[in-house]
């Protein structure tokens, strides 16, 4: 679900926000700042020696990203954020959730449970499922000839995906912790 949302943001950002009066480099600058913030956060995980602690903190990071995404989407009208601020917060929360889960989460998961293998299978499987969702959305739009209001769609999907992923990652975090404590007995 996070991959579908990321694809929509990246592929249809010009349709989501009308920034015709802004520099064409604005999107790149926002994503550069987001990337640097996330790299800084990820660098801190090099100091975690305990894999279960790192894994649970990564889950917390994903949940925080999802909850922020949900909050900003659900209360968009109330918050009355400027489009650039809204885009920055949405990008940061989406990429924190997506990149955390898509990258270092699987490394720590494999290390925590001493699974023989590498992250390639997990990442390929998640990518396949995500791209299948994107293709389904775009095919439905094209074949049913649906006109979309991209901003409303993105905000609605962000709210829904953020809420669902928050719940699922909370459950997953509890299950991972329980499994880890059972294996350590």
Which positions does each model-derived feature cover?
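Transmembrane alpha-helices of Major Facilitator/SLC transporters
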Residues: 4, 24-51, 65-69
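Juxtamembrane "helix-exit" motif on the non-cytosolic side of transmembrane helices
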Residues: 12, 16, 71-80, 139-147
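Alpha-helical transmembrane segments of polytopic membrane proteins
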Residues: 25-36, 88-94, 152-167
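C-terminal transmembrane helical hairpin of 12-TM major facilitator-type secondary transporters
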Residues: 50-100
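A late C-terminal transmembrane helix in Major Facilitator Superfamily
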Residues: 109-145
């Amino acid at each position: 679900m996070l991959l579908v949302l990321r694809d929509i943001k990246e592929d249809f950002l010009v349709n989501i926000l009308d920034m015709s009066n802004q520099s064409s480099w604005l999107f790149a600058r926002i994503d550069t700042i987001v990337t640097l913030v996330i790299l800084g956060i990820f660098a801190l995980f090099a100091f975690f020696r305990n894999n279960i602690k790192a894994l649970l903190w990564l889950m917390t990071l994903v949940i925080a990203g999802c909850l922020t995404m949900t909050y900003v989407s659900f209360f968009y009208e109330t918050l009355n954020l400027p489009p650039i601020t809204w885009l920055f917060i949405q990008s940061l929360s989406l990429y924190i959730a997506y990149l955390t889960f898509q990258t270092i989460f699987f490394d720590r998961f494999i290390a925590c449970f001493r699974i023989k293998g590498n992250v390639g299978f997990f990442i390929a499987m998640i990518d396949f499922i995500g791209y299948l969702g994107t293709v389904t959305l775009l095919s439905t739009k094209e074949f049913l000839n649906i006109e979309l209001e991209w901003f409303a769609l993105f905000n609605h999907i962000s709210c829904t995906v953020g809420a669902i992923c928050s719940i699922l990652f909370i459950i997953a975090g509890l299950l991972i912790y329980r499994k880890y404590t059972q294996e350590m007995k």
